[in-house]
Amino acid sequence: MSVDLGIDLGTASVLVYVKGKGVVLKEPSVVAFDRDSNVIKAIGEDARLMLGRTPGNIVAVRPLRQGVISDYTVTEKMIKYFVQKALGKRLFKKPRISICVPSGVTEVEKKAVEEATFAAGAREVHLIEEPVAAAIGAGIDISKPCGNMIVDIGGGTVSYTHLRAH
């Protein structure tokens, strides 16, 4: 049986959608790690609680800036953690993952998201521009021949798109 996930990888938070179950996870995009050993100490809400409250060797960071990856390795580990947390122990087959990217990002930035998602354990990766994902999430049929203005306000970006099917 195939497992399909949708991930909104945001600057401020990550949402994970599991087909047939809906949104199963919403956590901050924060990772805490030991600067000396490079060992991850916490991810998500647990790491957010550590922001500004850690000893000098523990650093809590947000690995995305303005919707794009600023720390590839940390982002990969964060994606892997959230996928495993969303699916629990039932991960027999690698999931297919559709993951959002801001509109207007470069091909290099798109490739980084795709590679990090594959490295995190995906068997297939589909990149979806955030405004298109927002439209689908809002119940808009993007295949209908009518225009829609979509404004996506995120933690690190604001984007707008005019969607029109032909």
Where are these regions (language model features)?
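Nucleotide/phosphate-binding catalytic cleft detector across ATP-hydrolyzing
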Residues: 1-155, 163
